[in-house]
Amino acid sequence: MELKNYLKKAQREKWAIGQFNFSTLEQLRGILAAVSKTKSLVILGTSEGESRFLGLEEILALVEISKMKYKIPAYLNLDHGKDLKWIKKAVDFGYSSRNLLILDNPLTYILSHFHTMF
């Protein structure tokens, strides 16, 4: 099921989906081990800096392998991305969602480029 469907279901049924950022394999394993005990789904986040440091391909591979190992639905979120080109690249690589931090970009710039990205 797509993340947006889970988000709608959670809102309708009044329950939450946890989102946890990770920057190491150990953190990812810890998050997924805890979530698997509750048989819940999870949103896994990386900041723009973390995703650049770890690499989008590597993050996606780690998450896909971990989803199979722990048998839970997990979705990737780019947390507080600033660079519109990097956000687009993350989505193209398989990130399910993104939070856009627009403090460093004028709103007119964001609006003029956003429609061409997604």
Predicted region positions:
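Glycine-enriched alpha-helix->loop->beta-strand junction motifs that scaffold or abut catalytic
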Residues: 38-40, 92-97
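Hydrophobic faces of well-ordered beta-strands that scaffold small-molecule active sites
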Residues: 16-21, 42-46, 74-79, 98-100
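N-terminal amphipathic alpha-helix/helix-capping segment at the start of soluble metabolic enzymes
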Residues: 1-19
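Active-site loop-to-helix "anion-binding N-cap" substructures in soluble metabolic enzymes
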Residues: 87, 92-95, 105-110
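N-terminal active-site wall of soluble small-molecule enzyme domains
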Residues: 4-5, 27, 50-93
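Conserved anion-binding
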Residues: 99-118
